[in-house]
Amino acid sequence: MLLEIARWLSDDVRAIGVLEYITMRAVLACATALLIGLVAGPRVIRKLTEMKIGQAVRAYGPESHLVKTGTPTMGGALILIAVAISTLLWADWTNRFVWVVLLVTFGFGWIGWMDDYRKVVYRDPEGMPARQKFFWQATIGLVAAVYLAFAVSAPANTELWPLFKAWVSSGFAMPLPTRADLIVPFFKSVSYPLGVLGFVALTWAVIVGTSNAVNLTDGLDGLAIMPTVMVGSALGIFAYVVGRVDYSKYLLFPYIPGAAELMVLCAAIAGAGLAFLWFNAYPAQVFMGDVGALALGGALGTIAVIVRQEIVLFIMGGVFVVETLSVMMQVTWFKYTKRKYGQGRRIFRMAPLHHHFEVGGWKETQVVVRFWIISMMLVLIGLSTLKLR
């Protein structure tokens, strides 16, 4: 919004032209989201407490977590509000990628809100039935995936509907341009063409998978939000690179017209995340809830797809990946051994992985900070792919 005002006033106020620079607006978006979060945070926490929107702790979780019962939850709404206001203030409203990321973010946020509502109102720690939750995640992810298959492939300011009709007319066999290929990091010219159906399938898996992965990681005070901030910031750098003709050509990345504007949104996520961490650090005054975790995961996955860094997201979000794999391995092994031996056996003391270390004697703060350190190292490895090719 402010960019449009700046363009309108640019002839009279020359200095305001600085807002044409994406990097400047990214800094301002981060600062705005941070300020909104810090100012509104105490009021939101107080309101959640008055409304008795408290966390319902699972009975089979670590015993040390029982003291968290009643801590205000659904604080992820604060993050979403800060991100939305900051992005709408500083981003270019004509950019299609900004809107699709915002819509996916709030779509998954709505799913999380409904899930948290069931937990709070009905005092059901399990929340929304798994099948119902997955249905809505799959639906939103599929719609976004189909849209992005053509949005990423299209030249700047091109209508997408004619491209979709051309794909249907081709018998669903129309190839996508090379910039929509799956990029393999650390190699200069290695990429794999996906086609529309392959692109949609991969995009769907990345968006839905990342959303659930962040949600599974959000089990300790501050554990999920800091890796989200780091990964989101790194994706903002990738967005800036692939969204510029000069940088993308020099660093051998595909040029994605309009992607650079996502740096503003990524900066807003980082600022809002840091503000939330102020209140979510141990001992947490508020929890993110599914409304925040599902939304942020969906945002990261969508941005990674747009900037064509799905594999790099897998690297940088390694903490999210390992947490998810630990749950999958635990459940699969337990069911298999129960069928074979009549009694389920476990690989980990408890899943997700952060509980395994908690039960093993690590303090909650030790688990969190060590996972942060690992996440930082993985993000640096991901950023190194900008040059190590």
Curated annotation (Swiss-Prot):
Pfam families: Glycos_transf_4. It is found in: Cell inner membrane. Its EC number is 2.7.8.13. It catalyses: UDP-N-acetyl-alpha-D-muramoyl-L-alanyl-gamma-D-glutamyl-meso-2,6-diaminopimeloyl-D-alanyl-D-alanine + di-trans,octa-cis-undecaprenyl phosphate = di-trans,octa-cis-undecaprenyl diphospho-N-acetyl-alpha-D-muramoyl-L-alanyl-D-glutamyl-meso-2,6-diaminopimeloyl-D-alanyl-D-alanine + UMP. GO terms for cellular component: plasma membrane. PROSITE patterns: MRAY_1, MRAY_2. Its cofactor is Mg(2+). Catalyzes the initial step of the lipid cycle reactions in the biosynthesis of the cell wall peptidoglycan: transfers peptidoglycan precursor phospho-MurNAc-pentapeptide from UDP-MurNAc-pentapeptide onto the lipid carrier undecaprenyl phosphate, yielding undecaprenyl-pyrophosphoryl-MurNAc-pentapeptide, known as lipid I. This is Phospho-N-acetylmuramoyl-pentapeptide-transferase. It comes from Bordetella petrii (strain ATCC BAA-461 / DSM 12804 / CCUG 43448).
